[in-house]
């Protein structure tokens, strides 16, 4: 009887120990599985973030390259050379020249533009002065005399002829480049591209340093 009781107790204890061991082993396996799942999840999340950052950097580079290419194309269409267009896109100073209109950006490949949209600026054409006709009788009004009407008609005809006949947008000597002599220069040329008869260059400050 006592042996049976001791055997039952021993069997119960052994079963409890075996069950506890199985439970501990199961929990350890479950923890290991959770750890591997978390590790894989972190790796996938890091990989996803790295790919997204790479896509963002690539998209930003493509957008920047497109914007720079657009600016370069616009500058080239405006007449700038390839070197000046690239320098302007990069933020560097471009080539500038001095002419009779002042300092301007060099755009040798641009088409001539004017202040009038859709047409050219008319160049005044001097017309021969006409002698005033002397009226033999009556009260003469200079504002309504035949000579005034004739001058008005001649002026309108000259404007029409200059607008449709002369297609030059500038004066013949307006775009000639002038190279000024710096104050400390000893080897610069003093030749001007425009005849001295057009401008009194002796009284202009820009020509104060020209050697004679």
Swiss-Prot record:
Subcellular localization, as worded in the UniProt entry: Virion; Host cytoplasm
Domain of life (superkingdom): Viruses
GO cellular component: host cell cytoplasm; viral capsid, decoration
InterPro entries on file: VP2
Keywords: Capsid decoration protein, Capsid protein, Host cytoplasm, Virion
Keyword GTP-binding part of the UniProt annotation: no
Coiled-coil segments on the chain, per record: none
Pfam assignment, any one: RNA_capsid
Record family assignment: Belongs to the norovirus VP2 family.
Assembly and binders: Homooligomer. The portal-like structure consists in 12 copies of VP2. Interacts with capsid protein VP1.
UniProt comment concerning the protein's domains: The N-terminus domain points away from the virion surface.
Other facts noted in the record for this chain: Translated by a ribosomal termination-reinitiation process from the bicistronic mRNA coding for VP1 and VP2.
Name used for this protein in its record: Minor capsid protein VP2
Native species: Norovirus (strain Human/NoV/United States/Norwalk/1968/GI)
Organism classification: Viruses, Riboviria, Orthornavirae, Pisuviricota, Pisoniviricetes
């Amino acid at each position: 009887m006592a042996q049976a009781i001791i055997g039952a107790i021993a069997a119960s204890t052994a079963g409890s120990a075996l069950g506890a061991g199985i439970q501990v082993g199961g929990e350890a396996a479950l923890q290991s599985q959770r750890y591997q799942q978390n590790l894989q999840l972190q790796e996938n999340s890091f990989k996803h973030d790295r790919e997204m950052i790479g896509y963002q950097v690539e998209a930003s580079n493509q957008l920047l390259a497109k914007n720079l290419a657009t600016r370069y194309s616009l500058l080239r269409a405006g007449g700038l050379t390839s070197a000046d267009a690239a320098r302007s896109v990069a933020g560097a100073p471009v080539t500038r020249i001095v002419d009779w209109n002042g300092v301007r950006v060099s755009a040798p490949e641009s088409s001539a533009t004017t202040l009038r949209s859709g047409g050219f600026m008319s160049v005044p054409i001097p017309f021969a002065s006409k002698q005033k006709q002397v009226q033999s009788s009556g009260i003469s009004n200079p504002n309504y005399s035949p000579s005034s009407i004739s001058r008005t008609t001649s002026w309108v005809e000259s404007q029409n002829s200059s607008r449709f006949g002369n297609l030059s947008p500038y004066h013949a000597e307006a775009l000639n480049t002038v190279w000024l002599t710096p104050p400390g220069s000893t080897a610069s040329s003093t030749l001007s591209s425009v005849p001295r008869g057009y401008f009194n260059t002796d009284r202009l400050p820009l020509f104060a340093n020209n050697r004679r």
